[in-house]
Design a protein with these regions (language model features):
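Conserved small/polar residues in nucleotide/adenosyl-binding loops
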Residues: 1-8, 254-261
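Active-site rim elements
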Residues: 21-25, 163-174, 220-228
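Active-site groove signature of glycoside hydrolases
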Residues: 6-21
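Extended hydrophobic/aromatic segments used for targeting, binding, or gating
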Residues: 206-227, 231
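Catalytic cores of secreted or luminal carbohydrate-active enzymes
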Residues: 228-249
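Short acidic/histidine-rich active-site segments
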Residues: 194-199, 203
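Active-site-proximal loop/turn and secondary-structure-junction residues that shape catalytic pockets
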Residues: 19, 55, 199
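Conserved alpha/beta catalytic core and glycan-binding cleft of carbohydrate-active enzymes
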Residues: 30-195, 210, 245-248, 252
Length: 261
């Protein structure tokens, strides 16, 4: 990793299923030797370190539990924002906390807003467009009888499953994507946008398209007017965020979300 940083000028690393790296004798140890090695390395300790802070094992969900020098994919941000914009009950208190930097997760050990990598979609799962267009996954093309991929997507199709010519449904979907982009880019923390979401890319409801090297997973850059409008909207949000320091504070705003009903 040090060699890659020095020779290729890569400024950071993202660790997949990073909780695995902290396991000692099957248990997750936040003081594991791996973290000691990273902290003591004169090169790696100075680069951006981003964790996917969970794995498949017992006790593997470690959002908020990594050392202060790390940033983390905030899975609780993703889940809360999805639930809020599909009008799930009792989500407002937690939504406010996520918008303000998730201090309930990161304030304990004095971490800053950059500890939270905020995201709504990623390379796994639904695209933003599919998140507002499908209630169910449609992975039949993967050849596993639609058994693969996450079944609990916290998505809402706005009234019709998949593509439709109904004007009101399509307008609502466009608004929902804007709602989520605005939330993401106006939140404290680091915003992460999955490439293609800014032009409403679809995978036709496939939320596990790793095996699809075809139109299902490709980005079509022949944009229609709705896609161009969404791209312009996202671009303006990014400029707004860059222009206003209050949207990327150096210190957390302290909140304590109420438990859900």
């Amino acid at each position: 990793a040090s060699d890659v940083y020095k020779r290729q000028h890569i400024d950071g690393f993202r660790f997949d299923l990073a909780a695995t790296l902290a396991r000692q004798f099957q248990e997750v140890d936040k003081l594991s030797a791996f973290f000691d090695i990273v902290e003591q390395d004169p090169v790696i300790s100075r680069v951006k370190l981003i964790a996917e802070p969970w794995d498949l094992g017992s006790g593997g969900y470690q959002v908020g539990g990594f050392p202060s020098s790390w940033s983390e994919w905030n899975g609780r941000y993703r889940d809360c924002v999805r639930d809020f914009w599909r009008s799930q009950p009792s989500t407002l208190p937690e939504f406010a906390s996520r918008l303000m930097g998730s201090s309930d997760l990161y304030q304990v050990n004095g971490r800053r807003p950059v500890a939270s990598v905020n995201f709504i979609t990623a390379h796994d799962g639904f695209t933003m467009n599919d998140l507002v267009s499908y209630n169910e996954k449609h992975n039949e093309a993967n050849g596993e009888g639609n058994r693969d991929g996450e079944s609990n997507n916290r998505s809402w199709n706005c009234g019709v499953e998949g593509p439709t010519t109904i004007k009101d449904v399509n307008e609502l979907r466009q608004q929902q994507m804007r709602n989520m982009f605005a939330t993401l880019l106006l939140s404290q923390g680091i915003p992460m946008i999955c490439g293609g979401d800014e032009v409403a890319r679809t995978q036709q409801g496939n939320n596990n398209a790793y095996c699809q090297d075809n139109a299902i997973s490709w980005t079509n850059w022949d944009l229609d007017e709705d896609q161009k409008d969404l791209l312009e909207f996202v671009s303006k949000l990014i400029h707004l965020r860059l222009e206003h320091p209050v949207l990327h504070r150096r210190c957390l705003l302290y909140t304590s979300p109420s438990p859900r009903d």
